[in-house]
Amino acid sequence: MTIFDNYEVWFVIGSQHLYGAETLRQVTQHAEHVVNALNTEAKLPCKLVLKPLGTSPDEITAICRDANYDDRCAGLVVWLHTFSPAKMWINGLSILNKPLLQFHTQFNAALPWDSIDMDFMNLNQTAHGGREFGFIGARMRQQHAVVTGHWQDKEAHTRIGAWMRQAVSKQDTRQLKVCRFGDNMREVAVTDGDKVAAQIKFGFSVNTWAVGDLVQVVNSIGDGDINALIDEYESSYTLTPATQIHGDKRQNVREAARIELGMKRFLEQGGFHAFTTTFEDLHGLKQLPGLAVQRLMQQGYGFAGEGDWKTAALLRIMKVMSTGLQGGTSFMEDYTYHFEKGNDLVLGSHMLEVCPSIAVEEKPILDVQHLGIGGKEDPARLIFNTQTGPAIVASLIDLGDRYRLLVNCIDTVKTPHSLPKLPVANALWKAQPDLPTASEAWILAGGAHHTVFSHALDLNDMRQFAEIHDIEIAVIDNDTHLPAFKDALRWNEVYYGFKR
């Protein structure tokens, strides 16, 4: 069972009574066939639920009102099977607060050249019915997605499925609670921001809990629970000699297990699905939570270090979006560079907290080593390299008057040499279009040093995310040229200034 099983998407057909009862009967019959086929064959993440035809303003408004108040409804897919006068949709669309997708399709794929008549033409009017609906969306400044293609086309299935992921993610975000253990890392700017504005824009709440509250829960964990979790570690990871049963760091592993169990219990009791820590505020914890954070991220929790609640929330959002897809998604940080003409590389990592969902190894290494930051006992952590291939890094920043999402398309590569003295998980990548352009564009746009790294999602997913939340997006990819990128930032400043 996944988060998508908690939601459904309503399939709404637009028509009108002008065409008579027989045409409406055929429209309903077609709709039932299409919905059944999509649910059976399209591998959509959510179930489609067919609603009664929308043939009048009152019917359409009732459907939209019901969608707003049904917690299981993640959004609406609308198909204009016949012409559906768009003034009928104004009241409904004006109150609708769920995501909307217009499926611009028709029942038949090919025209019946020898038999086509006006009855056929009147029944299958998506081509201009969809344009009428599009006009009222544009006239009302209504943000909605559009997918064109036959309902049996796999590309259309993929695009509808991707939109469904966004719709569910948006509903989950409205309920998201972010827990900050301690406050922001002292004097750091980009990790701070306006939490009230974030809740207004996205719906997630951010609040702080004292580390002492967490420590109380951690200290309440019994040996039996710790032993059971240690057994799971033994079967899931390759333990170094120091962390094995008679190793000199075995107690550190037990303490890491205690912290993991305590953190998870605290988060579950509070209904949190994202959290932050900071190494400046660990009073009462014996070690920086490394292994605990890595494993909680793999279970779907959002996380970021140094109190960075925006990145923690974004990671949770992207975890939901990518549920069930191939490839992982993790907290990440651009850590250091390899400058080599034509082969510039970025080594990404963090002190400890990189999610094993992006690991190339089936069984990462579990080790305990010294950490020179935080002044605590040596922490446990998982060490691994990252899968290769296309990926993205994304950053959500607070510009005061709006939010900006930055996305850099990257290509992760195999580490050309072993890293015997680097005791942390890491990812190595080439930034698109090249490191100088990518880094300069990122810096000019104000991108954070913390990001969400993902093999599972791509630029199209993040464009949809920005659209569905109505925020700015700045893209750095192989098509990026700095002069044009700078111009786009200036134009966005004007556009969003007028939009306020």
Swiss-Prot record:
Binding of Mn(2+): at which residues? E306, E333, H350, H450
Q: Which reaction does it catalyse?
A: beta-L-arabinopyranose = L-ribulose
Which Enzyme Commission numbers does its entry carry?
5.3.1.4
Q: Which cofactor does it need?
A: Mn(2+)
Tell me how the cofactor is bound.
Binds 1 Mn(2+) ion per subunit.
Query: Keywords in UniProt for this one?
Result: Arabinose catabolism, Carbohydrate metabolism, Isomerase, Manganese, Metal-binding
Modified after translation how?
Answer: The N-terminus is probably modified.
Instruction: Determine if Lyase is one of this entry's keywords.
Output: no
Which pathway or pathways does this protein act in? Answer: Carbohydrate degradation; L-arabinose degradation via L-ribulose; D-xylulose 5-phosphate from L-arabinose (bacterial route): step 1/3
Q: Which GO terms describe its molecular function?
A: L-arabinose isomerase activity; manganese ion binding
Q: Which GO terms describe its biological process?
A: L-arabinose catabolic process to xylulose 5-phosphate
List the GO terms this entry assigns under cellular component, sorted alphabetically.
Answer: cytosol
Highest taxon of source: Bacteria
List, alphabetically, the Pfam families matched.
AraA_central, AraA_N, Arabinose_Iso_C
Q: Which family does it belong to?
A: Belongs to the arabinose isomerase family.
Subunit notes for this chain? Homohexamer.
Q: What does this protein do?
A: Catalyzes the conversion of L-arabinose to L-ribulose.
- Protein's recorded name: L-arabinose isomerase
Q: Which organism is it from?
A: Salmonella typhimurium (strain LT2 / SGSC1412 / ATCC 700720)
